[in-house]
Amino acid sequence: MTQTNFRSGPDVNGLFGSFGGRYVAETLMPLVLDLNREYEAAKADPEFAKEMAYFQRDYVGRPNPLYFAERLTEFCDGAKIYFKREELNHTGAHKINNCIGQVLLAKRMGKKRLIAETGAGMHGVATATVAARFGLPCVIYMGATDIERQQANVFRMKLLGAEIVPVTSGTGTLKDAMNEALRDWVTNVDDTFYLIGTVAGPHPYPAMVRDFQAIIGKETKEQMQEKEGRLPDSLIACVGGGSNAMGLFHPFLDDASVEIIGVEAGGHGVDTDKHAASLNGGVPGVLHGNRTYLLQDGDGQITDAHSISAGLDYPGIGPEHAFLHEVKRVEYVSITDDEALDAFHQCCLLEGIIPALETAHALAEAMKRATNLRDDHLMVVCLSGRGDKDMQTVMNHMAAAEKTQEKLV
C-alpha cells in the first residue's frame, strides 16, 4: 500500500482505478451526464449545503451518538468498542442520509416522480419517507423473496404512500429489483428521478451516495476527538453494496494509522455457493452500470447471492470498495449467517440494542478481533440499522434450530 491519497477518486469518467464508470443504455447516457452536472453544481452551492444541514439536523436527527459499548467491551476483554449509532436516525438506518440528499437534488432538477430499488426495505422506507415529505409520487421495486421476509417494511412503505412493485424474475431479490428499476428509468427519463440506495450504479451515483453518507465518518472523527482526543485505531462496517461502510470509511482513508475492515455476508461459507461475498468469492465484471467485483459462474453469468440478511443479499459491491480492495487500503472479510446471528443475540443481551442482521455481521467481526487486541485500542463499529425488520427472520431461524436440536436428542 504505497498510495497516500485514497480520497481523490473518481476521475472525470467515474473510475476508481479500473472500477466504476458509466455502462448504461444510450437513452440513459444524457440523463446520467445531466445528473452529474447538476450534482457538481449542487455541491458548489451554499444554499444546497444549508438545506441539507437543516434536514439532517431537524428531520433525520443528526448528529447521532458515538456510544461506548461498555458491556460488550468487558465481554470481549480487549479493545474499547464504540458504536456509531446510525440506527437512531429517523427511519432506523443510515439510508435516510442519502435519501435526503438525492430528493433535494431531484427537487432542484424539477423531477416529479421518484423510483427506487430495495432489498431489506430500509432504503425503500427512507425513499417513501422523503417522497411523502416532499409530496412526490414514489414507486419502489422489491424482490418477491424480500417482500416475504420483510413484511413490516412493506407495510411501512405503503403507509407512507409508496407503490410497491413485486419483482418475480431471477431470485426475486435486490439484483432483480434494481434491474426493474433501471427499466422504469429508461422508459420515464424525462420526469423520473432514480434514487439509488447504495454506492453502485453508473457514475455519479457511487460518488454521490458516498458523499451523502460521509457525514457518518465526519461525525465519528469529531466525536472520537472529543471523547478520546485522537483518531480510532480501527473501523468496522458491514458491506453489501457498501454505502454505510463507505460513509464511515471515506473520511479516514488517508489516515494511515486507522485500520479499516469491511465485512461481507459469508452466508453458509465462501467455500459454498451460498454466500454474498463479492470480493472474497467473486471476479471483476459489469453490472448495473458499473465495473466491479461480482459473483459469476464460469461463463460470466451473474450467480445468485445468499445471506440471512436481505440488505447484504447482492451479487456485487460498490466500485470504490473494489478499488480499495485491490490497492489493499481496506481489508475485506466475511462472516457467516450463524456467526452474525450469534453476534445479534450478544448485542441484544449485553447492550440492550437490537441490531439489524446486516449490522450483526460487523459486530461478529468486531467481537472476533477485539478479544485479541489491547485495551487501549479504539474500535468503531457502524451500527447501520436497527433489527425491528428482522424479527420474523430471527424467530424462524430459532424455531428451525430448535426443531433440529429436538431431532438430535
From Swiss-Prot:
It catalyses: (1S,2R)-1-C-(indol-3-yl)glycerol 3-phosphate + L-serine = D-glyceraldehyde 3-phosphate + L-tryptophan + H2O. Its cofactor is pyridoxal 5'-phosphate. GO terms for cellular component: cytoplasm. Pathway: Amino-acid biosynthesis; L-tryptophan biosynthesis; L-tryptophan from chorismate: step 5/5. Disulfide bonds: none annotated. PROSITE patterns: TRP_SYNTHASE_BETA (PS00168). Its EC number is 4.2.1.20. InterPro entries: Trp_synth_b_CS, Trp_synth_beta, Trp_synth_beta/beta-like, TrpB-like_PALP, TrpB-like_PALP_sf. The modification N6-(pyridoxal phosphate)lysine is found at K95. The keyword Iron does not apply. GO terms for molecular function: tryptophan synthase activity. Keywords: Amino-acid biosynthesis, Aromatic amino acid biosynthesis, Lyase, Pyridoxal phosphate, Tryptophan biosynthesis. It comes from the Bacteria. Belongs to the TrpB family. Tetramer of two alpha and two beta chains. PANTHER family: TRYPTOPHAN SYNTHASE, TRYPTOPHAN SYNTHASE-RELATED. The beta subunit is responsible for the synthesis of L-tryptophan from indole and L-serine. This is Tryptophan synthase beta chain. The gene is trpB.
